Amino acid sequence: MGGVTSKKQRRRGGNLYERLLQARGETYGRLWEGLEGEYSQSQDASGKGLSSLSCEPQKYCEGQFMNTPWRNPATERAKLDYRQQNMDDVDSADLVGCPVSPRVPVRIMTYKLAIDMSHFIKEKGGLEGIYYSDRRHKILDLYLEKEEGIIPDWQNYTAGPGIRYPMFFGWLWKLVPVNVSDEAQEDETHYLMHPAQTSQWDDPWGEVLAWKFDPKLAYNYKAFVEHPEEFGSQSGLSKEEVQRRLTARGLLKMADKKKTS
């Protein structure tokens, strides 16, 4: 179904995985060597609240920032259902060249690995300026899982509105609101994804988002600094203060709507 234009839009959406595949082939472990000293200084200057999150390189608190069944120990059936949902949300055209199982041993995302992958993708032009959508979110998860063996439990961003900061310390890609004119929306060069999946209607705040690389996120945990309430009890805030801040931002009301919808 659909005309010629819809096929063009669909094909452009499927190019993301291909672009990420083309970015492979180099090792970026050397990036950590230049960051290690500065990172240590940043950690020493951090407050107790940030230290309590255990953001040191090579450390990871399982379930800390997850939105998958692994957050709370689940049955194997629940995990399989989650993986199947991810696969169902990604078209078969997106899976061209995608291996059935990870090419390397499965591993969790770490601070160092997030830094390396961020620079790796940036230097190959894989995400800069690309419109964000839930579908592309899953494509990125799928790519890193199949090509790098990284369990897809780490990619979360602050709720908005405005700039959405990564909640996993070390991931250097944030989401920024962009203005898209009516003319640009009709221009074929802007059809990186079907409009139904990139329009402001997909975002609860009515914003169109795009990925943007920010190297300062390697030293400044903006998600925690700007929105500690989104980390719940790990923020060091009282339960009442967390509730107050979430209510002031309209996040609790939004969560209630999702439950009733």
Swiss-Prot record:
Supply the source organism for this entry: Simian immunodeficiency virus (isolate PBj14/BCL-3)
Annotated region Acidic: the residues are 88-94
Q: What is this protein called?
A: Protein Nef
UniProt lists the gene as: nef
Q: Which cell locations does it reside in?
A: Host cell membrane
GO MF term (any one) = GTP binding
Q: Where is this region: Mediates dimerization?
A: 138-154
Q: Which UniProt keywords apply?
A: Host cell membrane, Host membrane, Host-virus interaction, Lipoprotein, Membrane, Myristate, Viral immunoevasion, Virulence
Pfam families linked: F-protein
Family membership noted in the UniProt record: Belongs to the lentivirus primate group Nef protein family.
Q: Would you tell me the Gene Ontology cellular component terms?
A: host cell plasma membrane; membrane
How is this protein situated with respect to the membrane?
Lipid-anchor
Q: Which InterPro entries match?
A: HIV-1_Nef_core_sf, HIV_Nef
Q: List the disulfide bonds.
A: none
The entry's function note states: Seems to play a role in optimizing the host cell environment for viral replication without causing cell death by apoptosis. Enhances virus infectivity and pathogenicity. Probably involved in viral immune evasion mechanisms.
Q: What is known of its domains?
A: The N-terminal domain is composed of the N-myristoyl glycine and of a cluster of positively charged amino acids. It is required for inner plasma membrane targeting of Nef.
Lipidation sites (N-myristoyl glycine): 2
Q: How does it assemble?
A: Homodimer. Interacts with host CD247/TCRZ; this interaction induces down-regulation of cell surface TCR/CD3 complexes.
